[in-house]
Swiss-Prot record:
GO terms for molecular function: proton-transporting ATP synthase activity, rotational mechanism. F-type ATPases have 2 components, F(1) - the catalytic core - and F(0) - the membrane proton channel. F(1) has five subunits: alpha(3), beta(3), gamma(1), delta(1), epsilon(1). F(0) has three main subunits: a(1), b(2) and c(10-14). The alpha and beta chains form an alternating ring which encloses part of the gamma chain. F(1) is attached to F(0) by a central stalk formed by the gamma and epsilon chains, while a peripheral stalk is formed by the delta and b chains. It comes from the Bacteria. It is found in: Cell inner membrane. This is ATP synthase subunit delta. It comes from Chlorobium limicola (strain DSM 245 / NBRC 103803 / 6330). Its main location: membrane. Gene3D superfamilies: N-terminal domain of the delta subunit of the F1F0-ATP synthase. Belongs to the ATPase delta chain family. HAMAP family: ATP_synth_delta_bact (MF_01416). One of its GO terms (cellular component) is proton-transporting ATP synthase complex. F(1)F(0) ATP synthase produces ATP from ADP in the presence of a proton or sodium gradient. F-type ATPases consist of two structural domains, F(1) containing the extramembraneous catalytic core and F(0) containing the membrane proton channel, linked together by a central stalk and a peripheral stalk. During catalysis, ATP synthesis in the catalytic domain of F(1) is coupled via a rotary mechanism of the central stalk subunits to proton translocation.
Length: 181
């Protein structure tokens, strides 16, 4: 089984158990804290992925590192991952969990690149329009990209909406070279 499929299945299992057991908020908070810890500790991720370290040792490491932040139900899940030799996939499982939770809650991640910094009002207006366009709640990640020359580009999953001056100039060049203008 590919690691992505396995990660998604483990994430789905935890999400389902958290919903049924009514500890969804606690599990989500714990996983966010674990994700942050893993992002700040490459050594820990390396240890969890190492085939040289057995499952019992990984279980002990997970318990020592996360017992304060994980809570008992999430710790059971972490022990299961170590037992099933999937502890090394913990970062991917957390990522898949977040994606599944976002799907469940109707949230979509959007990247917005602009040539100039948008004002709070402009950003809020753009996010509202994107929410209307997608029919979902929008979690926007704003980024300044001066190479656009002007305008914005928006990436929604696999779709890119390019309203930049750079893109318009490229299209004009293409039409001029093709003799279509």
């Amino acid at each position: 089984m590919s690691s992505l499929i396995a990660s998604r299945r483990y994430a789905w299992a935890l999400l389902s158990a958290a919903e049924e057991g009514q500890f969804l908020d606690q599990a989500t908070d714990a996983l966010n804290s674990i994700k942050e810890t893993l992002a700040n500790s490459r050594d820990l991720v390396h240890v969890l992925r190492s085939p040289l370290i057995n499952g019992d040792k990984k279980t002990h490491i997970l318990e020592e590192v996360f017992k304060e932040i994980a809570g008992e139900k999430v710790m059971i899940f972490l022990r299961l991952l170590a037992h099933k030799k999937r502890a090394g996939q913990l970062p991917e499982i957390i990522g898949e969990y977040q994606k599944l939770l976002d799907e469940k809650n109707g949230v979509i991640n959007v990247s917005i690149n602009s040539a100039v910094m948008l004002s709070d009002e402009q950003a809020k207006d753009l996010v509202n329009k994107l929410a209307n366009y997608t029919g979902k709640k929008v979690r926007a990640k704003m980024k300044l990209e001066e190479a656009l020359l002007g305008g914005v580009t928006v990436k929604i999953e696999d779709t890119i909406i390019d309203g930049s001056v750079r893109h318009q100039l490229q299209m004009m060049k293409k039409f001029l070279l093709a003799g279509k203008l």
